[in-house]
Amino acid sequence: EMVGLPPRVYDMYPHELSGGMMQRVSIALSLMHHPKLLILDEATTALDVITQRQILDELMELERQLQVTRIMITHDIATVAYACHKVAVMYAGQIVEFGDVADVLREPQHPYTQALMRTIPAQPRETAIVRGIPGSIPDLSEPIRGCAFADRCSLARNICRNEEPPQITMPGGSQVQCHLAGGVKHAG
């Protein structure tokens, strides 16, 4: 009942459930042992927008009611903007930027976060031109020297390719792992 499922769902088979119902069942199962931490990996992927919003609303309410901490792993920036307080932006397995969602999305400091924000279409999806980030991710089977994003970054300097970037705390409290943080804006 906490996740919005009628009792009849208990007797149903997985193939009889919609995508949203299956997500709710998964969430209900994960809450059975009263966890303090709930990790949700792409919890709203492949759901229609209305069902996504319902699931997110339910998750936020469960977080409040049960006092459970929620970590969401997602590539959907709209989900982050709607349902999260903090965001950690990762590239090649490293957190490159961390902070309050509003601050990071409004004024991203890391060149990867800035490039990621530019990939979001400003127009309706039917007419939007999707802009990707040029280049390829690094080979993660080998140790990365310097910044993992350097080969794709238009602002990269020699230091970026040769030295691991420092973690810098910005005036607003966000943390950025970049040699250029705060001093240079990524050209759009």
Set out the residue ranges of the language-model regions.
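ABC-type ATPase nucleotide-binding domains, specifically the catalytic core motifs of the NBD
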Residues: 1-5, 16, 99
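Conserved ABC ATPase "signature" region
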Residues: 1-8, 114-118
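Interfacial catalytic loop of ABC nucleotide-binding domains
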Residues: 8-13, 128
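Conserved ABC ATPase signature
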Residues: 13-17, 21
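P-loop NTP-binding/switch modules centered on Walker-like glycine-rich loops
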Residues: 34-39, 43-129
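Short catalytic/signature loops enriched in Gly
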Residues: 98-188
